[in-house]
């Protein structure tokens, strides 16, 4: 049996090089009270100042350096907010919290990020000021949230539903910083594909903006062989009233497709084969029969990869009323194909790059059921890539897709415009959901009287309500300031005017806001205020901030350099 001293002697110190998990992590820096809040507020101010310059029709652009490519020029609040990363850890914490406000508003409403940022700054700033004078931060937060609930209820009362394409165009124009062309093109797109239809934004190839409406199921796979071309008008293959054979597997054997060809021939209908691939004997036989006998057939590779391909093929089967061969869990063999296994479409157009199936003859109830399945998946998924793919599939099964192609003279111009188009698109969707209120910050100003009827439980809650009263004036003041006029005077004049009057910063005059088309989606204004108040009032309750102290890296190269210099010197003489 070992005695205690012997045990101690046998224990060896473990090298930290050999066991890096035993090394100490970064040391922490802790700041308390007013010092921590003051530093965080400077970060909030820096970010909010950078974002606020973009607000309103006379707002300026922000140029952001990028690690690759040319600098980005934008007027999009959330893009500016995301680009800011401060060196000082405490300032950065303040900036990041307001960045979260902009991100949340962008994800929920798709617009209003600049409004959310300036509101958050105002609430945080006023909150810090009152707390430093001895107010209770928890009660202030309660007062703030009480006031916000009252404002949201008042916004819902003010809200009017969007009914006409003109109103949709007005919402889009305001969100795109007064660009009427963008407003009109978005209104046209919504007219064509419906308010719930899918509208995508892409880079255009020309100087002008273009709108393309894609009806039916279009996917980016063309014919496998150019020998399938059957028309002299362009390099494409066109069929009317055709059968569709869908296969998840590769088709190489000619025996497997003969039954489908015989069915198509017996019914005197063309056949479209969509499979993982068609090659070898099967492809050469199809091409030979196409050229020699005039067989009406075209082979196309299935779109997508993995699960996405399976889902798209299943969508096609439901839309055309057919079945997918080679699908897991089903024992369907290509050799046993029956007429009811083939999909039916009114028209097919296949080019070298893409294929389009129009007027699918699928069961309407089955299509509707599939659409509902995709909508449910959309609600659950958090991945942006998944959402994009699900939206594409949804569009193909419903009213089709509108593609907005944004034109311009350079990449920088196109990217700046694309940001505005995306914002405008999100704003119109939000307007269709919850209706519209007065724009230019007026809707929030008109909610101030509703706060007078609130009864706070104590003096600190009353301070919270007063903070929101002053904060509601900030968006209108910022828009006026960016237009080069005194914000507080403008706000005072709006408050004294009748309820539908506001300030048009573009022309510098007081106008009937609805009549002039200066309107905002209710959802955007509501989300901006709710997100700003939630995060900023929580920020004011902070008493301690903990950050990491970065380790100072020693430069390993300097000693070697000195020695090298000495050696070189010796060699020279």
UniProtKB/Swiss-Prot annotation:
GO terms in the biological process aspect are:
protein refolding; response to cold
Q: Which UniProt keywords apply?
A: Acetylation, ATP-binding, Chaperone, Isomerase, Isopeptide bond, Mitochondrion, Nucleotide-binding, Phosphoprotein, Transit peptide, Ubl conjugation
Q: What is its EC class?
A: isomerase
Residues bearing the modification N6-succinyllysine? 31, 82, 125, 133, 191, 202, 205, 218, 236, 250, 301, 352, 396, 481
Q: Where in the cell is it found?
A: Mitochondrion matrix
PTM-bearing positions, type N6-acetyllysine: 75, 82, 87, 91, 125, 130, 133, 156, 191, 202, 205, 218, 236, 249-250, 269, 292, 314, 352, 389, 396, 469, 481
The residues joined by the cross-link Glycyl lysine isopeptide (Lys-Gly) (interchain with G-Cter in SUMO2) are: 551
Coiled-coil regions listed in the entry: none
- Sites where the protein binds ATP: 75, 111-115, 440, 520
Kindly list the positions at which N6-malonyllysine occurs in this protein.
133
Query: What coarse category fits the chief subcellular location reported for this protein?
Result: mitochondrion
What this chain does, per the entry, is described as:
Chaperonin implicated in mitochondrial protein import and macromolecular assembly. Together with Hsp10, facilitates the correct folding of imported proteins. May also prevent misfolding and promote the refolding and proper assembly of unfolded polypeptides generated under stress conditions in the mitochondrial matrix. The functional units of these chaperonins consist of heptameric rings of the large subunit Hsp60, which function as a back-to-back double ring.
Q: How does the record describe its quaternary structure?
A: Homoheptamer arranged in a ring structure. The functional units of these chaperonins consist of heptameric rings of the large subunit Hsp60, which function as a back-to-back double ring. Interacts with 2 heptameric Hsp10 rings to form the symmetrical football complex. Interacts with HRAS. Interacts with ATAD3A. Interacts with ETFBKMT and EEF1AKMT3. Interacts with MFHAS1.
Put simply, this protein is called: 60 kDa heat shock protein, mitochondrial
């Amino acid at each position: 049996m070992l005695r205690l001293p012997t045990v101690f002697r046998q224990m060896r110190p473990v090298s930290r090089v050999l066991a890096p998990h035993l090394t100490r992590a970064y040391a922490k820096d802790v700041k308390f009270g007013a010092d921590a809040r003051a530093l965080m507020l400077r970060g909030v101010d820096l970010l909010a100042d950078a974002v606020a310059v973009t607000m309103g029709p006379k707002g300026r652009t922000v140029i952001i350096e990028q690690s690759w490519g040319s600098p980005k020029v934008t007027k999009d609040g959330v893009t500016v907010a995301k680009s800011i990363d401060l060196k000082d850890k405490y300032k950065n914490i303040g900036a990041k919290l307001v960045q979260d406000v902009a991100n949340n508003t962008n994800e929920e409403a798709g617009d209003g990020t600049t409004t959310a940022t300036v509101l958050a700054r105002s609430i945080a700033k006023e909150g810090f000021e009152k707390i430093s004078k001895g107010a209770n931060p928890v009660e202030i937060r309660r007062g703030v949230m009480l006031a916000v609930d009252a404002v949201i209820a008042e916004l819902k009362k003010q809200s009017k539903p969007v009914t006409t394409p003109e109103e949709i165009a007005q919402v889009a124009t305001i969100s795109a910083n007064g660009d009427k062309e963008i407003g009109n093109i978005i209104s046209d797109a919504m007219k064509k594909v419906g308010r719930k239809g899918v509208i995508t934004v892409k880079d255009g190839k020309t100087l002008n903006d273009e709108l393309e409406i894609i009806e039916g199921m279009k996917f980016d796979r063309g014919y496998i062989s150019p020998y399938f071309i059957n028309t002299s008008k362009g390099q494409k293959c066109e069929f009317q009233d055709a059968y569709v054979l869908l296969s998840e597997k590769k088709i190489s054997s000619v025996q497997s497709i003969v039954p489908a060809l015989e069915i198509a021939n017996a019914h005197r209908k063309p056949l479209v084969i969509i499979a993982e691939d068609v090659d070898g004997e099967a492809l050469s036989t199809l091409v030979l029969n196409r050229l020699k006998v005039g067989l009406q057939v075209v082979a196309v590779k299935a779109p997508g990869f993995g699960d996405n391909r399976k889902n798209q093929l299943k969508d096609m089967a439901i839309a055309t009323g057919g079945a997918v061969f080679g699908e897991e869990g089903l024992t369907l063999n290509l050799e046993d194909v029956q007429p009811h296994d083939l999909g039916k479409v009114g028209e097919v157009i296949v080019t070298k790059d893409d294929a389009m199936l129009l007027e699918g003859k699928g069961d309407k109830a089955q299509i509707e059921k599939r659409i509902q399945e995709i909508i449910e998946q959309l609600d659950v998924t958090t991945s942006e890539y998944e959402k994009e793919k699900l939206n594409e599939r949804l569009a193909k099964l419903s009213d089709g897709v509108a593609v907005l192609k944004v034109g311009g003279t350079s990449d920088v111009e196109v990217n700046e415009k694309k940001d505005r188009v995306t914002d405008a698109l999100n704003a119109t969707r939000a307007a269709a959901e919850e209706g519209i209120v007065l724009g230019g910050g007026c809707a929030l100003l008109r909610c101030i009287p509703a706060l007078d009827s609130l009864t706070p439980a104590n003096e600190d809650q009353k301070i919270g309500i007063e903070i929101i009263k002053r904060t509601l004036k900030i968006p209108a003041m910022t828009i006026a300031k960016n237009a080069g006029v005194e914000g507080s005077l403008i706000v005072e004049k709006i408050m004294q005017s009748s309820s539908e009057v506001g300030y048009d910063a573009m022309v510098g005059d007081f106008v009937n806001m609805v009549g002039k088309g200066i309107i905002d989606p209710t959802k955007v204004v509501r989300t901006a205020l709710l997100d700003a108040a939630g995060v900023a009032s929580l920020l004011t309750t902070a008493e301690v901030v903990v950050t990491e102290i970065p380790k100072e890296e020693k430069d390993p190269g300097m000693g070697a350099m000195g020695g090298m210099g000495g050696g070189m010197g010796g060699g020279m003489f």
